[in-house]
Amino acid sequence: MSQASVDMEDVKPSISLPSDDGGAMEARLTDVCKSKLALDESTMRQAMILFRESKHILLANMSAIGSGSPEEIERFWSAFVLYCVTRLSKGRTKQEKEENGITLCRILRVLKMNVVDFFKEIPQFCLKAGYILTGLYGSDWEKRLELKELQANIVHLSLLSRYYKRAYQELFLPNDASSGRHSVAPNSVGYVSDYHHFGWLLFLALRIHAFSRFKDLVTCTNGLVSILAILILHIPARFRNFHIQDSLLFAKRTAKGVDLVASLCDKYHTSEDELRRVMEKANNLIVDILKKKPCAASECKRENLAYINTDGLIYFEDLLEENSLQSSILILEDNYDDAINSKGELDERMFVNDEDSLLGSGSLSGGSIKMKRKYDAMASPAKSITSPLSPPLSPASPVNGNPVIKMVPITPVSTAMTTAKWLRNIISPLPSRPSTELLCFFSSCDRDITTDVTRRASIILGAIFPTTSFGDCCISGNLQSVNQMDSIWAEQRKVEAMKLYYRVLETMCRAESHILNGNNLTSLLSNDRFHRCMLACSAELVLATHKTVTMMFPAVLEKTGITAFDLSKVIESFVRHEETLPRELKRHLNSLEERLLESMAWERGSSMYNSLIVARPTLAAEINRLGLLAEPMPSLDAIAVHNNISTGGLPPLPFQKHEHSSDQNGGAVSPKRACSEYRSVLVERNSFTSPVKELTLTLNLKSKLPPLQSAFASPTRPNPAGGGETCAETGINIFFNKIVKLAAIRIRSLCERLQLPQQILEWVYCLIQQILSQRTALFFNRHIDQIILCSFYGVAKISQMALTFKEIIYNYRKQPQCKPQVFRSVFVHWPSTSHNGKTGQEHVDIITFYNEVFIPSVKPLLVELGPAGVAQKSKSSPEDSNNADSQIPGSPRLSPFPNLPDMSPKKVSAAHNVYVSPLRSSKMDALLSPSSKSYYACVGESTHAYQSPSKDLTAINNRLNSGRKVSGRLNFDVVSDSVVAGSLGAQNGSSAPAPACSILELPVKREQPDS
């Protein structure tokens, strides 16, 4: 096969500008700075310096930024420069309250861009120009830029605004007293009533003055519900869309009337104590900002307060009367203007108008999730639909005398609130100290480790949840300090994480002791790294439940001193031993494991390389050349000092010094147990087995499992399970097995989108296995999707298929895990012997990577896969099998494509033309609307919180067997057998793969790349 047969033939033409146009771009940016943004001289000078320093990067990467004209790309780059300068210069000079602050919204409006496009492209700028920003603003520029936090904030605000709009429209009529003054009709899509507008502005005031700058989703939702309570009390009753005596809407009642706060908590799954606290803060804001006089609602006789138990409620006489409403809105607007001008933040008022062009209509999370429905943008690269704790079915108002069951809309906000309810009801009541049973396990070790465990938990969780402010704003006057609120919030979350940690640890110990018939678990419980991983998991679940913005994953890794590879060892064990864990949190952990496998475990500084260098000594030179090894895990004392945590005078852990001096990648073990680790049930079914043994374990679920201790032991230590492997070899085989499984899922999904035959799928899968085994270094510091995409194109070329890289990328963009930087920025470290004369490190597009790195390394493997290679193999003698490119000794054997969950339709019965099929990702969006979802029964998903799905299935069966006659006849001829038969391929085991000759003759679906 010639080089031409594997090189790229459909390279995207690079967009370039005339050589003298750099000066014109600089002049246009100067004009924007002066005439449109009115920047001061210092900021404008810094902007021009950054633009000049990075101009060569812009000109060299025009084709990798945006997707439009050179003018559009220039606007992108100008926006990046201006945003970085305005944010970083303030951070450097501490001018947080300077006048005429430049907000991101103002920059985007001037440059005619939207938020979604900006955040989709700015990672490219940061990656390409990162070294320039480091030189100008210091190594901490990325942390000070707060891009991830701001993006998460935008997604949360988008979700909250829709949540608020839906709740408002359910409670109040769309028109109000001043609607006649609006140019937009009350029933128009873009119409927002004054009362609606007032509520959102009051919520923003609450966010600014009572919450920290980046607050979690659950706290913000509590704030919105408190605003709804205030609106119910103050909006004139004639604009209500409900009756206060409606027992279905306001279910909580007392002898004095409706308990408004308790009813709203019941409806929106909020904490009553928390809601009352937030309402008090909102009332204080009304007093301090709007200068309204509060009075006890029990002393007021107003129509709005009829049938409501007013004990403990505050009422403001003229808060939302027509004569004062407009002035109140203007005061809140002015107050918000002052706030954002001093902080340079986003103008969050735009979210009250769903049609604001600044929001855009793209996706902030990759895949097909749009800005208007970014339900899981911050939690997972994979899409999810619901949670077992999704809001239950709630009765609607009776229609024609018959009660109708109405599905409560399932949104990320409602899901977060019901998940928080699990934390509140199941975890919070637990003790914050080890139980008597857990203390027994601690004291049964070779020495009592109780002090070690509790000290470690206090330090690690104290680092993750510091009692200092998460934000940086603090207000004066009668308003409460944000720092104090943050300290209370952090302490609450710390206690929740500690309770969860002790609960799961106790369950693990109990399961282990049953297997061992004893309570001495020294080997496991004395392992520092194991406990840190458990603490990180517990903290991450608490953070994920509250949807925090400031502590998004992987922040817990940095705080605990572990790596992504470490955490991947305990995720499944953690899920397995917390049976009440809501499905939404299980999905979150699964998505984290996917992120760890696809890229994070391959990054520089991953402890995976410390094991790999032992398991595959031939890779040591490349690992050292790239500087990939992990640093020693920081001691608890170092973490305590760094985070200013008091250790309470407790002595340091006795085994810390030993770990750092002799066992950087594992935990210390008791000398008495150094060679006697036991078998453990704390691991998933196949995660700690060699890939070649997978089939055996699949068929025999009772097989003995290797110990979890070995996963955290020194890489050079012999595996107690035997087989002559070191712990490093066992761990790497497990890790590689997971990588192969993840790759198989993504290969099949992309094959389906590309409509490629089964043979291509198997060849790509085989090639990935060979690369992982024989060309492992290709994965170093890269994303596995980069290798998968190149493998697709390479296999297409040797198969002589008319498949272009554009088509591959076009369809990859539709994958839920897609991120543009995967194919735009591939890490390359040119060796000193590089044929192109380049040296050092850089990030290139995937086309350059394919031609310059991938093909030179993988070409021999591709040749073997092709028809010529297969024919040559059949003629070769046994002695020829051990050539340079054959499988290396000790590497996993190549396996056929695994039996993944079948996505093909299957016929239910030979007598009926009825087919059932697992839900495809392309159909998920349709289920997200309540009206559509009511037509589906999702197996494994409960319709009520804390209810077993089996009860739902029983109810469905009872309804089906009730004997009720259907007046019409179902038409089963809509889908013919012949249509479905085509999709019942080899995946179902019902047909053999098509011959190679026919495969190569299949037409390849061609589509134009998206813009």
From Swiss-Prot:
Regulator of biological processes that recruits a histone deacetylase to control gene transcription. May play a role in the entry into mitosis, negatively regulating the cell proliferation. Formation of stable complexes with geminiviridae replication-associated proteins may create a cellular environment which favors viral DNA replication. The keyword Cell cycle applies. The lineage of its organism: Eukaryota, Viridiplantae, Streptophyta, Embryophyta, Tracheophyta. Residues 873-889 have a biased composition (Polar residues). GO terms for molecular function: RNA polymerase II transcription regulatory region sequence-specific DNA binding. It is found in: Nucleus. Residues 411-612 are annotated as: Domain A. Residues 730-860 are annotated as: Domain B. GO terms for cellular component: chromatin; nucleus; transcription regulator complex. Its main location: nucleus. SMART domains: DUF3452, RB_A, Rb_C. Keywords: Cell cycle, Nucleus, Repressor, Transcription, Transcription regulation. Residues 1-22, 872-903 are annotated as: Disordered. Residues 411-860 are annotated as: Pocket. One of its GO terms (biological process) is cell differentiation. The gene is Rb1. Residues 613-729 are annotated as: Spacer. Belongs to the retinoblastoma protein (RB) family. This is Retinoblastoma-related protein.
